[in-house]
Swiss-Prot record:
This is Gag polyprotein. A lipid is attached at residue 2 (N-myristoyl glycine). SUPFAM superfamilies: Retroviral matrix proteins (SSF47836), Retrovirus capsid dimerization domain-like (SSF47353), Retrovirus capsid protein, N-terminal core domain (SSF47943), Retrovirus zinc finger-like domains (SSF57756). A motif (PTAP/PSAP motif) lies at residues 456-459. It comes from Human immunodeficiency virus type 2 subtype A (isolate BEN). Residues 14-33 are annotated as: Interaction with membrane phosphatidylinositol 4,5-bisphosphate and RNA. This isolate is from a German AIDS patient (with predominantly neurological complications) who was probably infected in Mali. The lineage of its organism: Viruses, Riboviria, Pararnavirae, Artverviricota, Revtraviricetes. The keyword Lipoprotein applies. A zinc finger (CCHC-type) spans 389-406, 410-427. Residues 477-511 have a biased composition (Basic and acidic residues). Residues 73-77 are annotated as: Interaction with membrane phosphatidylinositol 4,5-bisphosphate. Residues 12-19 are annotated as: Interaction with host AP3D1.
Amino acid sequence: MGARNSVLRGKKADELEKVRLRPGGKKKYRLKHIVWAANELDKFGLAESLLESKEGCQKILRVLDPLVPTGSENLKSLFNTVCVIWCLHAEEKVKDTEEAKKLAQRHLVAETGTAEKMPNTSRPTAPPSGKRGNYPVQQAGGNYVHVPLSPRTLNAWVKLVEEKKFGAEVVPGFQALSEGCTPYDINQMLNCVGDHQAAMQIIREIINEEAADWDSQHPIPGPLPAGQLRDPRGSDIAGTTSTVDEQIQWMYRPQNPVPVGNIYRRWIQIGLQKCVRKYNPTNILDIKQGPKEPFQSYVDRFYKSLRAEQTDPAVKNWMTQTLLIQNANPDCKLVLKGLGMNPTLEEMLTACQGVGGPGQKARLMAEALKEAMGPSPIPFAAAQQRKAIRYWNCGKEGHSARQCRAPRRQGCWKCGKPGHIMANCPERQAGFLGLGPRGKKPRNFPVTQAPQGLIPTAPPADPAAELLERYMQQGRKQREQRERPYKEVTEDLLHLEQRETPHREETEDLLHLNSLFGKDQ
């Protein structure tokens, strides 16, 4: 523990706490990182005391540098921490880990020549594709030697076929696992597949067709001199009539090499692509987004189906620009059309994030519920004509009952008289149905009152109704005349006598009884 505490002291410990773990990050190095690095050095058989000096850190970096490209995350973190400690010992001011890493690597290459002094055994054994010495064929002592496929590679291939079941991922997976393989190795991979024999038969038929085509395009030149290697036939490329040594010689001979491994891989890829179409019959035109499906899930299904399509890149580009937007649901389509012409996939994913999901549905339902529960909008004209609310107690506008300072009104709220309430007010007005007959409830139709000063525009009355009204008036007059006393009748007759002078005497005789008794009365 003492060695760990003595790695950085004083000013160096203060400088360590100023170095950031990541560029632009907030976290910085602490002493606990030094303790962790010392514990990790024990796993590589390195002493903790090497961290106390600049030369010791250089020795650690020489050991760890070749392992960094293929190392784990802990190894890379240890390498970065040692680079920071080396910069502190070298009194190099750095701001973050990346800057310290670049400075330490530059110093190793310039001064110690670490890259040139690395042993060949620590370098990758598999060179890039297309070059000689590709795995599993390696060069040893000037001769090419075949190395069988590892069980891990075969297991990865079998697991890929079982999990994906000849999906679109099988073709690139086969290309990666069969890099640099001979026809013998490729046949081993195909023989490891136990299930899906129908797909294997499809691949065999494709191989036979391609082999026959190869034989027709490359006829036998004729008899060859003794000891000269013959040219491969279609069956030789398929590995049925050729040995591993012949396949290696065809692939790496100085004159006219024939890459039988790559040719056979191409035939297998054609068969796998046909199997992908058979096992995935869904056409890309049928890939449409569901009404509640997230846009990201729809894009994944679309590109998975597009990957299985065996068409030109130009056609795939057209499908991406047109079908991706055309087959989206109405909600996402409305958003995508607002992005303009030819939007990028990142823009589309960002714009449609959350569209069609539960969050958007809940938001739409909340907005609809808010509109339904809220007050209906008042037209502008009605809002202008609407009167202000008047408080019933004081009769003033602009305040409510809680803000009113006037004393509370006593008695009826309608007429203001004491002794009764508004429900029993005798001066109450009729509603829109009017007052009912004889104190009963009003009828079921509104009472309309014609406003004064207006000329009615109704059609003229019925003549029969007018005649009936006239007869009723005459009968009323006759009834009144019958009820009048006799004196009033006499006065009427006297008035009638004064009007008619020629008959005055006759009328007088009728009024007096002289006509009957004469002068005897």
